[in-house]
Amino acid sequence: MLVLHNSQKLQILYKSLEKSIPESIKVYGAIFNIKDKNPFNMEVLVDAWPDYQIVITRPQKQEMKDDQDHYTNTYHIFTKAPDKLEEVLSYSNVISWEQTLQIQGCQEGLDEAIRKVATSKSVQVDYMKTILFIPELPKKHKTSSNDKMELFEVDDDNKEGNFSNMFLDASHAGLVNEHWAFGKNERSLKYIERCLQDFLGFGVLGPEGQLVSWIVMEQSCELRMGYTVPKYRHQGNMLQIGYHLEKYLSQKEIPFYFHVADNNEKSLQALNNLGFKICPCGWHQWKCTPKKYC
């Protein structure tokens, strides 16, 4: 596998992957952030250049210091040739199978290769599939300003009752972590803090000034960790967040997407109402744990 460092090559790859969305959306979103300051210190691997068939994004080696931190040790994969993936994944310099890690992608065809290689290395695999949503409409042209206050200006015109909107920062990480189904531990707290330092987090404040609904963007441009305090559910808070975020991110030409469990009927309905499109390819995650950590 080749590591792509050249900014021109990364841009060519990025534009090429756009043609394979939604299946390529995970690596596409990660490369967007790699091109833009690369705050998570990630890198891009391809099996060949320019005629690539496999793309993997992963943290640089110095980032993966904790062998049990699967939040940091996350790989995103897209392939045009699933039959070649098993061989590539078996290379020790591609995937650090001795660590607890996550592999994420939007192709069900990744499953066989991941499981075969994991089994050969005595690694336990916990698999999850959810529904992938992407924006229905093409992104608008980029605006001239990069000021987040644009979103506040939109919000000031759309306040309802005693609710208002705000951007999150790292001080909100504890609250987000406490209510994130995949979090609630020290490693996830550090991960969320980092996401909120480097990417967009957005929430709704309730009548008493407390945060009642929120969502956070992560290193592959996915909007995750969405939560609404039970007392304030079914009041349109997440719809409000979704509406303004869609407008803001589209204006900035920042890719974004969501995954939702198939039994989360309220979120499914909300995203449908906002005009997001369900992608048949689905969203897939493989948490891989070496036997020594099971």
Curated annotation (Swiss-Prot):
Pfam families: Gly_acyl_tr_C, Gly_acyl_tr_N
MF terms in GO: glycine N-acyltransferase activity
Biological-process GO terms, alphabetical: long-chain fatty acid catabolic process; medium-chain fatty acid catabolic process; monounsaturated fatty acid catabolic process
Keyword annotations from UniProtKB, A to Z: Acetylation, Acyltransferase, Endoplasmic reticulum, Lipid metabolism, Transferase
N6-acetyllysine, modified sites: K19
Subcellular localization: Endoplasmic reticulum
Catalytic activity field: an acyl-CoA + glycine = an N-acylglycine + CoA + H(+); (9Z)-hexadecenoyl-CoA + glycine = N-(9Z-hexadecenoyl)-glycine + CoA + H(+); octadecanoyl-CoA + glycine = N-octadecanoylglycine + CoA + H(+); (5Z,8Z,11Z,14Z)-eicosatetraenoyl-CoA + glycine = N-(5Z,8Z,11Z,14Z)-eicosatetraenoyl-glycine + CoA + H(+)
EC number(s) recorded for this UniProt protein: 2.3.1.13
Residue intervals passing through the bilayer: none
PTM note: Acetylation at Lys-19 drastically decreases the production of N-oleoyl and N-arachidonoyl glycines.
GO cellular component entries: endoplasmic reticulum; mitochondrion
Tissue specificity note: Expressed at highest levels in salivary gland and trachea. Also detected in thyroid gland, spinal cord, prostate, lung and fetal brain.
EC top class named in words: transferase
Domain of life: Eukaryota
PANTHER family: GLYCINE N-ACYLTRANSFERASE-LIKE PROTEIN 2, L-COA N-ACYLTRANSFERASE-RELATED
Family recorded in the similarity comment: Belongs to the glycine N-acyltransferase family.
Known role: Mitochondrial acyltransferase which transfers the acyl group to the N-terminus of glycine. Conjugates numerous substrates, such as arachidonoyl-CoA and saturated medium and long-chain acyl-CoAs ranging from chain-length C8:0-CoA to C18:0-CoA, to form a variety of N-acylglycines. Shows a preference for monounsaturated fatty acid oleoyl-CoA (C18:1-CoA) as an acyl donor. Does not exhibit any activity toward C22:6-CoA and chenodeoxycholoyl-CoA, nor toward serine or alanine.
Name used for this protein in its record: Glycine N-acyltransferase-like protein 2
